[in-house]
């Protein structure tokens, strides 16, 4: 009989308060998510002070609900896992403090988790991981290609030099009058439009795996503002389609090139922007055409955004590998995987 390991996991890196109970890193017994989107929408983005206050209000409620839904108590737990970075320092501290308090009070090991590792392991709920593997992480704060030679080993081979893809979505969303977060609406609009504006594909042909989206963002904003000054009304669906096509072309091109150079057994697609239907469809197509022997695991739609279930999955791996933190664990807002020299 397989030994049962229960992990209580905390995620509070940005604007979602989430607590989950995970069995053996692969079974979700509960995954409570308290979102703050309504509070941040009128500001057009996340306000750190507001986010921290909401985390304080929600963290105890979420913890109690997670335990109740999983039908377990503290005595059943084997470990407490928590995101300690990257993210907003004030938000991270709420989760870290709660996790430390519970670990201390119930004499449980405290397992630190990198938020980005959590996003990768969200795909673990879809199927078994095979190594070596490549992960394309696309979110509001990060856009990275991560090579994993083995479990618990992460090497960045490419990343954005400026804006993350999700950040660019939100910024152009403001120009289009779309509420934060803008990604879902722009994805829906893009499906109704055509790539008529031919926005730049920055760094697409450069001999590396890095990304850049600030030039695309500027080109988009200038196009809309110039049209406004001429009194010209541009089609919002075509604008969305043109923007999204530029983003997807670069993400897909760089990912295929990375897979050409790094023989892997699997590709993982994860992060908030991994919920984008256009991106999923393009990668499905390109993998079948260019790398038919490499299976792709896409994080489930409901686990693409920030949640504690993904932290529990990554936390279980860390727990198995002996990762432990003391009660002096602190938030590390700029936490990163190691960067390696590209092949």
UniProtKB/Swiss-Prot annotation:
The keyword Lipid biosynthesis does not apply. One of its GO terms (cellular component) is cytoplasm. Signal peptide: none annotated. Coiled coil: none annotated. GO terms for biological process: tRNA threonylcarbamoyladenosine modification. Keywords: Acyltransferase, Cytoplasm, Iron, Metal-binding, Transferase, tRNA processing. Fe cation binds at residues 115, 119, 306. This is tRNA N6-adenosine threonylcarbamoyltransferase. It comes from Limosilactobacillus reuteri (strain DSM 20016) (Lactobacillus reuteri).
């Amino acid at each position: 009989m397989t030994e049962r390991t229960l992990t209580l996991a905390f995620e509070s890196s940005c604007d979602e308060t989430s607590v989950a109970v995970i069995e053996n890193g692969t079974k979700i017994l509960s995954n409570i998510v308290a979102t703050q989107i309504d509070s941040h929408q009128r500001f057009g983005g996340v306000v750190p002070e507001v986010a921290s206050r909401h985390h304080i209000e929600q963290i105890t409620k979420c913890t109690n609900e997670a335990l109740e839904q999983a039908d377990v108590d503290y005595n059943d737990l084997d470990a407490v896992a928590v995101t300690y970075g990257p993210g907003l320092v004030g938000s991270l501290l709420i989760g870290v403090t709660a996790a430390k308090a519970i670990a201390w009070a119930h004499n449980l090991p405290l397992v630190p988790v990198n938020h980005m590792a959590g996003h990768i392991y969200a795909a673990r709920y879809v199927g078994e991981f095979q190594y070596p593997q490549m992960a394309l992480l696309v979110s509001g704060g990060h856009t990275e290609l991560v090579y994993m030679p083995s479990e618990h080993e992460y090497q960045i081979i490419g990343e954005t030099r400026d804006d993350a893809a999700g950040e660019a979505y939100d910024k152009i969303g403001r120009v289009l009058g779309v509420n934060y977060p803008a990604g879902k609406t722009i994805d829906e609009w893009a499906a109704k439009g055509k790539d008529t504006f031919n926005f730049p594909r920055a760094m697409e042909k450069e001999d590396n795996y890095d990304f850049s989206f600030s030039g695309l963002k500027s080109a988009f904003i200038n196009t809309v503002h110039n049209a406004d000054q001429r009194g010209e009304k541009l089609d919002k669906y075509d604008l969305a389609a043109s923007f999204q096509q530029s983003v997807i072309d670069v993400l897909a091109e760089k990912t295929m090139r990375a897979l050409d150079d790094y023989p892997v057994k699997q590709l993982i697609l994860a992060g908030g922007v991994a919920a984008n239907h256009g991106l999923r469809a393009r990668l499905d197509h390109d993998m079948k055409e260019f790398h038919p022997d490499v299976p792709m695991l896409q994080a489930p739609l409901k686990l693409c955004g920030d949640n504690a279930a993904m932290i529990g999955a990554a936390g279980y791996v860390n727990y198995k590998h002996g990762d432990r933190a003391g009660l002096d664990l602190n938030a590390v807002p700029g936490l990163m995987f190691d960067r390696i020299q590209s092949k």
